[in-house]
Amino acid sequence: MGRLFVYDENMTDERAKITVAKMAAVSDIVASEKAFIQYSAAGQLTVLAGAVIAVGDAIFQTEETTLSAANLDGASSFAHGKDYYIYLCDNGKDSSNEVYLISENSTFPDGVEWDDTNTRKIGGFHYGFVRNVDEYGREVNTSGSVRGSGWESNVREDIAPNSVWTALHRPKCDPSGMAYLGNGLWADIYLASDDGANGLQSVYNATPITGTEGLIWLCNANFSNFGNCDNMG
């Protein structure tokens, strides 16, 4: 369906008509399914139809759309160990539908025409090693045997299916480098490492926090507002 509202002073375009149904649907993001972006095939995601999304002063209603590396804002392929962010973009033309871009940028996509006023981050995912499983989600080896010899190394590079998040289906914290385990639980994909800003992160190929950093690092990172570390017992 694309652009849900347009300006037409003669009201001949159906999209210019404000109806009770339209107004009832419009808020920040409205979707019948919170996970309105889903893994659908190797290297592909599907945006489900019917989500209503505001971008600046424009409002769009999604059609079922397949996203892939072709939607990247610069590169031609996904890179191993990277987090990607999915944007719905408005080019400002009433005759045009929404534009989907995938970017490593967490603010807005690359391109002189895009900024934080005409793009909306609606989801994201992590790209890396994914274990091959059968239709029931059980780990298999290259011969298809459940937990058969060598199953541990039977992996592929792909979008991690349970890392896909949306603005409505995500953890309360930054979802980068995380995966959904079910029952409302999200977890880091990688062992926690120092983000360089007195916090932790889940990123590929980083040195994990080992515990040998000691209490001093912990105090500086998390307890700077609670007095001297010597008083912590």
Predicted regions and their residues:
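Short aromatic-cysteine micro-motif
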Residues: N132, Y136, N141-S143, V164-G233
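Acidic glycine-/aspartate-rich tracts in secreted/extracellular proteins
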Residues: D90-N97, L191-A197
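Carbohydrate-recognition beta-sandwich/jelly-roll modules
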Residues: E33-I53, E113, D158-A179
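Residues within well-ordered beta-strands of beta-sheet-rich folds
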Residues: Y85-C89, W186-D188
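Short, surface-exposed terminal/edge motifs of secreted or surface/virion proteins that either
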Residues: R15, G92-P109
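Polybasic, proline/glycine-rich intrinsically disordered low-complexity segments
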Residues: S103-I159
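Glycine-rich, flexible loop motifs
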Residues: A16-D83, G92
